[in-house]
Amino acid sequence: MAFVSEREIVRKIFSKKIDFTILAFFYISSIFFLLCSGVLFQYFTAAFTKGNCYECSMKLDYIKQFYFSLETAWYLISAVAVFIASVFIQHRIKAYLTLLAITWIVLTITDVALIHALDNIAMNNILLNILYNLFGAILLSLFMCLSNSLLFHLNKIKHIPMILSAMIPLVSAIIIAILITAVIYLLFARQAVEIEMDISEGSDIAYVGVKDNEESFGFLNDKKTDTPTYLDVIKNGSLIYNDTQGLSGADIYIVSGCYALPDLLRNVPLDAKKSFLNVKKLEITQKLPMMGFIQGESADVMPKAASRLSLSKQDDKFMLASSVTDSQIKFKSNNAQLMVAFAFMPITTNGILHDYTYDIIINDKKYKIENHVAPLSRLDKNKKMKCEYQQISDLTNTYNINANYLTGFLLVLKPDDIINYNNSPSVLLKTDFAFYKKTYQKLDKIYDDISNGKLSSLRATGISQFSINGKHLSLRPESEIIISEGSLYGLVNKSKKIKIYGTADLVFVDNKIMNLRKITYLQSKLEIFGSSIMDILKYIFGLGLLAISIKFIHSYFKNDVNENLFL
């Protein structure tokens, strides 16, 4: 059959609308499944690292996202474009080269659009996609040409209805997609491993506990403490003191000219006439960052998201530090005195604020604090800090503070002597993000503030001891460990060391996954089918599969006939 113009093919399509619709459905579905399986193949073979596989799993739910998700839905556009190009197939070799070029371009445009949407524009990603797309276009174009020839033979020569003929490419595409997925599963599925690690000086871990905070591993999870807890409240801090009996006393000060540190806040002048009595509730809310400390009889951190824990040594003291996001920390009084002190860090995206206000609400009565802070000069840097105090009382509702350097507040909260074990007065800190830490003179005192409990995942550096299935791994101080989807337990052992151990489903050490299933596991899976890895290699190379394929493709394209389905 001679070459026919595209206009003539379009005219024929309009005369065979039903066949075109049937063909469009089955072809587009076939191309889509093949493209999705290609995405799966590229994802695991090209970039199987912590960056894109932190939560990956070869479970069914994870595999499904490569075929049925918003990201892969974009490839429907590519599938439609490739199908439209295939409609105009006439002579085999010309059609193949045209399809190859169009498929390569369409896939590259789609990938660039997705990379841009995911804000991951890097030249290495684009170049890698171009190479994979070329490989995919070569195979997909061959599939389309072979499918077209098969449909032409069945529909035009054997006169089998289009709806039955068009099912064959779809069934073939589904089988190919299943085979690719199965191979990826056998090669990249993970094997759960037993891990054990020590957290020592210099360690820094970010971790996620379990939903029940009482069962979670953590720092200051409902622990008695007689030393201050230092806090850097970075975002949206709210302090609430509650005394259900309403019998507490409170001395409240506006502090300026110094940081809120226990060593600086000494010999605070007290005017008993300005003390507040019968305090039931006290609240301070501030969006500005603030730094200070809270000292109570016990502390209970209630994280809602990932926490962080680091152990370090500064001068002659050890420090245990952590951070929380969107969380609460409760400091209980156990009917002893509570002290709360914070200095504001008036830093915004537009610079440093010199004028700002906040409210102190006591028993629903508002006291407005207006701050006017002079800028810090070069000469002031050499001056010794001196705290200045202004005690507030219920007689004045508004206070104007002209200060140097810093302003903040000091709360001295005095519960009644009547002991209420079930619900003693407490201070609750709510924050979107905060750091908290404690210092210790002796290392062994640190472990009193650690709660034994469960973890589900972690990211760690500075780990001194780490083993997988009993095998010790040699690590550098900067080596990074990532464990996800695990059943872990953290505790302080008899030797006064913090240990984390348990079962992990995903383990990375310095970007390298450590728990891929061994080749012996793949061997055992193949033995179920009465085969082995060597058998497969024999089939591939012993039968000369590659040579046979090349010979078939050569003979196929040599017979360059016109096989358009609508002519």
Swiss-Prot record:
It is found in: Cell membrane. GO terms for cellular component: plasma membrane. It comes from the Bacteria. It is a multi-pass membrane protein. Keywords: Cell membrane, Membrane, Transmembrane, Transmembrane helix. The chain crosses the membrane at residues 20-40, 69-89, 95-115, 126-146, 168-188, 528-548. This is Uncharacterized protein YfjW.
